[in-house]
Amino acid sequence: MTRREFLFSAGAVTMLSGCRTCDLFGSPELRFGVVSDIHVTTPGSAKLFEQSLRYFRRRGVDAVMVPGDLTDWGLRSGYRYVKEAWDRVFAGTDVVPLFCTGNHDFDGWGYGDMTMEMHANGYSEDDAMMRNGGMAACWEAAFGEKYDKVRCRTVKGYDFVSGEYYGYEELKDWLARNGAGLKGDKPFFYFQHLPIQGTTSDSFGWSDGGKVKPLLSAYPNCIAFTGHEHRPFIDERSVWQGEFTSVATPSLSYACFPGGHENGSGPRSGKFGPDVNGKMPPIQAMSMLPTRRDLRGGQGFVVNVWNDKVVIERWDLEELEEGAPAWVVPLPACVAAKPYDPAVREKAEPVPRFPQGAQLDLETRNTENRSGKWTIVMNCEFPSAIMPEGSRVFDYEIRAVPKDGSPALVKRFISPGYAKMAKFEPERQRFWFDVAELPQDKDYVIEVYARNCFGRTSAPLVSGVRRGKPGLEKVKPLEKKES
């Protein structure tokens, strides 16, 4: 077997290294950049978008795709700032903008916290596109191209079909009229804002409601890109293969987290639940990881198309470094292997392990919970788990396991390095939760597991046997006495 054959064998296909891989094979037939959820508000907020465009230009892209949420507030000014950034980089070139709308482009001016931020910066809903002639008129004025709920642009002979937000219901009729021209071995690219339900990792929440997957299932040569999820590209479930291929694009502006984590997304008050035990937990003791600027990941893709493969490079566009090994989709899709079939990936994805000699350190301490109330917590500290190069730990699970076989308390946590490249992962992890949830009047041990994105766990770190005394239910808040 030659080196070339080895690199593209089924076993090695997911370990290829971005642009270094592409260098092995020369120039592709087509190259395009992808960023999503850029959430432009003010001229300054377009800085990272412009930096990404400049990087894409250095890479010689033929087009740049943005699957929705170009703006945060849905104002005409946001589209103007997007177009100005584009023109500073690509004016006078043949590079094609492949943009579509997201929920923020239509409705962002009406979201509570966004409205407050908008007003604080001197903008208002008076400039909303939906109050100034509607989306089609504002789109055409800003970008100089006709707006349709479904449309097709062609770049170097490859078709790009977009479905607009509030326009997915039009795709069925559009494909009935035009779908025959998309069939065949040659890939075409579809993009929309919301996840295609039943495909990538976060497509079972706020998605397209199942409208699109049955339609695209007739096209094995379709490679779809979606936005909205704001999931960083460390989640290997962000690429999916079934009847077609679907790819979840990370956000250029800020990361979001999966639910069910003590320090993850949810109300800052901590009134969140039910937890992984199916119960409504007390107010969370651990503060949520910061959002927005503190979770800037600035991630996106460079997509390279050859006649026998599509290579999707994963880039940190703030660091301008390749953030993870490229995903490689073999072609033609109708007969090629499917390395990103979830059943295949779940078996192939490495399982984390803790360093040799790793120990779990436990202590109780007092702190404040998310509501600012004094709380006693169990503090758990241990070395970060490790994975083979190119893979990442997804999260950590801490269990309080009674020795009598009764149900364990289960808590999950996300590493502070979750939204970043591997080099930002801390050497040690530190998580905590309310001691009121621990078993009482029975022996138990604390177990810590590292998990990959498919939920497969490492061997645990295990504490010594502990036993709490009963009586927590007798603890009552102090009553304020009249002075």
What residue spans do the PLM features occupy?
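Beta-strand-rich modules
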Residues: 438-455
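Extended active-site neighborhood of metal-dependent phosphoesterases/phosphodiesterases
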Residues: 76-187, 211, 215-221, 234, ...
